[in-house]
């Protein structure tokens, strides 16, 4: 929040100075705001691969949903490039990185990073946007759902690159941008058209075995990220040759396309079968996705909290305070809350609320637009608020 101005300034200084001299493009696979570039190629080929690999035994509902997805292909492409242009994003793209061996992005693992560590990672972003996509799809909002799915696949593509799962940034190596430019310029020759099997064979069949969506998604992503990280050290650093880079781009871009096809296959089965990833699962964490109104002065610098009360009367509350500026007019902010009692089911939570506490004697009013709460890969609360919250106030959302 703005009140933590010192570290915000540190982060801003890093953003302007550490990336200087490398490039203004500090993200992973290239992508343009109009839905073109390497990221868009990956998702487009992912759908094409799945269509080519579809077994004749696939349920009609899956086929129908695949057709709906194809009808919204441009939204998938736009979503796949949007995270690199999102005005709400972290300046250093910290949440686009994920080391599959440490479960961290570079803000926790790299010694040169002196500002706040960022809890979100490329892997957690995949799960968040997949949950939002599934929720909107089941409501019939296919356009928005497909855009969210594209965002999820952006992060999946990021953690398949050699540099992002190795937590090697443009600060650590000039090769970060150079390699991804190399891949972008040659992306057409790295296209694949099949995962090498039909959807009733091992690769796709294994994708459907684990009904715990969060657990499946994390381990599925981990497998591809480990390959990308290994390729960085064996073929993609600045010490490697052009032939090595060609091999690295060929392998990791093929993995991105194949992995995307598999992820979309899981998504289509989940929405076609009405799978509820949260049934019977203990809730270890809650993810809040909060939209602040775009109305003038809707944001706040006051303290903001999220709390729950369980049926046995116990309460837990967390401060919502991301590094830098959050709760700004028109912003969308994400917060992850770890529960003390890991044996809770979602139905054990009786009440949820957000609370505002004055930071100064002259508090801001705050106008949230919407809040969604995600548990175990499912949106369990979707609350339109659109009310001004003034002073020291509590707003119940459940």
Curated annotation (Swiss-Prot):
User: Altering residue 180 to Q: what's the impact?
Assistant: Loss of all enzyme activities
Q: What is the lineage of its organism?
A: Bacteria, Bacillati, Bacillota, Clostridia, Eubacteriales
According to its UniProt entry, this protein's organism is Clostridium perfringens (strain 13 / Type A)
Positions of the UniProt region annotated as Linker: 275-283
Limits of the PLAT domain = 284-398
Give the recorded effect for residue 154 to G/S: Loss of all enzyme activities
Q: What is the effect of changing residue 22 to T?
A: In strain: L9 and BP6K
Name it. Answer: Phospholipase C
Kindly list the positions annotated as binding Ca(2+) 1. Answer: 297, 299, 364-365
């Amino acid at each position: 929040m703005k009140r933590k101005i010192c570290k915000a300034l540190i982060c801003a200084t890093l953003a302007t100075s550490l990336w200087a001299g490398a490039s203004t493009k500090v993200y992973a696979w290239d992508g343009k705001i109009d839905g073109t570039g390497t990221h868009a190629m990956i998702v487009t080929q992912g759908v094409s691969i799945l269509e080519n690999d579809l077994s004749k035994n696939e349920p009609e509902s899956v086929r129908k949903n695949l057709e709906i997805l194809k009808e919204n292909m441009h939204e998938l492409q736009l979503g796949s490039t949007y995270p690199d242009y999102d005005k709400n994003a972290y300046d250093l793209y910290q949440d686009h990185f994920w080391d599959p061996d440490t479960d961290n992005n570079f803000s926790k693992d790299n010694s040169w990073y002196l500002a706040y560590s960022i809890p979100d990672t490329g892997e957690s972003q995949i799960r968040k946007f997949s949950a939002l996509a599934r929720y909107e799809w089941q409501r019939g909002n296919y356009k928005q759902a497909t855009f969210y799915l594209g965002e999820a696949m952006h992060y999946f593509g990021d953690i398949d690159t050699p540099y992002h799962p190795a937590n090697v940034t443009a600060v650590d190596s000039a090769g970060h941008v150079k390699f991804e430019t190399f891949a972008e310029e040659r992306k057409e020759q790295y296209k694949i058209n099949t995962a090498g099997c039909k959807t009733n064979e091992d690769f796709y069949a294994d994708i459907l075995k684990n009904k715990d969506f969060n657990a499946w998604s994390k381990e599925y992503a981990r497998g591809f990220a480990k390959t990308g990280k290994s390729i960085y050290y064996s073929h993609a650093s600045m010490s490697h040759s052009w032939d090595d880079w060609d091999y690295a781009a060929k392998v990791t871009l093929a993995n991105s396309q194949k992995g995307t096809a598999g992820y979309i296959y899981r998504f289509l089965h989940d929405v076609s079968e009405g799978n509820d990833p949260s049934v019977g699962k203990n809730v270890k964490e809650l993810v809040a996705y909060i939209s602040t109104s775009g109305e003038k002065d809707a944001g706040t610098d006051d303290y903001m909290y999220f709390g729950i009360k369980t049926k046995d009367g116990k309460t837990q509350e967390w401060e919502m305070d991301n590094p830098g500026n959050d709760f700004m007019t028109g912003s969308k902010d994400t917060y992850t809350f770890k529960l003390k009692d890991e044996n809770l089911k979602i139905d054990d939570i009786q009440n949820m609320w957000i609370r505002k506490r004055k930071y100064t004697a002259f508090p801001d009013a705050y106008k949230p637009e919407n809040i969604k709460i995600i548990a175990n890969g499912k949106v369990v609360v979707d609350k339109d608020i659109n009310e001004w919250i003034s002073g020291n106030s509590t707003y119940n959302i459940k």
